[in-house]
Regions:
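Helical hinge/lid and interdomain linker segments adjacent to catalytic or ligand-binding clefts
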Residues: 1-70
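Generic preference for hydrophobic/aromatic residues in regular secondary structure cores
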Residues: 4-7, 100-106, 180, 189-191
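Extended, composition-driven regions rather than compact fold-specific motifs
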Residues: 10-11, 153, 191-194
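Short, surface-exposed, polar/charged, turn-prone segments marking secondary-structure boundaries
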Residues: 18-24, 76, 82-86, 132-133, ...
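Flexible glycine/proline-enriched surface loops and loop-helix/loop-strand junctions
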Residues: 25, 48-49, 86-90, 212-220
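Extracellular ligand-binding/catalytic regions of CAZymes and related secreted enzymes
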Residues: 41, 74, 171-178, 182-233
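Carbohydrate-binding surfaces of carbohydrate-active enzymes
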Residues: 45, 59-61, 65, 71, ...
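An acidic, glycine-rich "communication" segment
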Residues: 57-177
Length: 233
């Protein structure tokens, strides 16, 4: 349920999501919603390893990796499985099970609205970074066809935009990760290989709504037909 639960526990839309996830976990034979999410993460990794292509954005990037690494660690809040997270969860993370990130420090405090220190911008915390711009790297279509395809655009510099996970610390990327775009020493858009497939992570929620808030209306894409951010998506 993300850490939206801290603020929106009484909201009908979140209560509906909780009920839907609990029903699904029970129906599929999982002991809890976190166990269900870990199972989904494992299947996604298997999909990529077997030749699939994965694009994830916003918190789907960071939380997928944390779920993979927490195979034998409890990082879930008590409101999701009835037990508090393990205070030593960070030391029990298995980064060899993840695809793109490593060495993250898990944020287990229920009062801090962040998942880990993988995200550089920490949008909902007191140490939030301001938005800037991110230049796209220029790749050779001959020698790097996939990165060249992923960065194809009509502009070379794009305005940044927030998300629950906005960006990625460079020192949290595995050595094989390819940075497609970054702002200084902060990666925005990354790509990598796993087995026969590839994964691509793009930080942020909505390129045309950089300060997106709960309850905001959906972006009307008809008004943004030349959006460079949506072109990447």
């Amino acid at each position: 349920y993300s850490k939206f639960f801290l603020t929106y526990a009484g909201s009908p839309w979140l209560q509906e999501e909780v009920s839907r996830n609990e029903e699904m976990a029970e129906r599929l034979g999982f002991g809890s919603v976190p166990d269900l999410k870990k199972g989904v993460a494992r299947r996604l990794r298997q999909y990529v390893d077997g030749g699939g292509f994965l694009l994830a954005m916003c918190s789907a990037t960071e939380t997928l990796e944390l779920a993979l690494g927490a195979e034998h660690a409890d990082i879930a809040a008590s409101y999701s499985d009835g037990s508090p997270p393990d205070p030593n969860a960070t030391s029990k993370m298995e980064w060899d099970l993840t695809m793109g990130f490593m060495d993250g420090v898990v944020q287990t405090s229920p009062s801090v609205n962040a998942f880990s220190d993988i995200d550089a911008h920490q949008v909902n915390t007191p140490w939030r970074l301001e938005l800037g711009v991110f230049p796209l790297f220029d790749f050779s279509a001959k020698f790097d066809p996939v990165p060249a395809m992923l960065t194809q655009n009509h502009v070379s510099v794009i305005s940044d935009f927030y998300g629950l996970t906005t960006s990625f610390r460079m020192d949290r990327l595995k050595p094989g990760a390819i940075v497609l775009a970054k702002d200084g020493n902060i990666a925005k858009y990354v790509h990598g290989n796993l087995g026969e497939g590839t994964w691509t992570y793009f930080g942020g929620h909505d390129p045309e709504d950089p300060e997106h808030q709960i309850g905001d209306p959906p972006t009307n894409l008809d008004l943004h037909r030349s959006s460079p951010g949506y072109r990447l998506i």
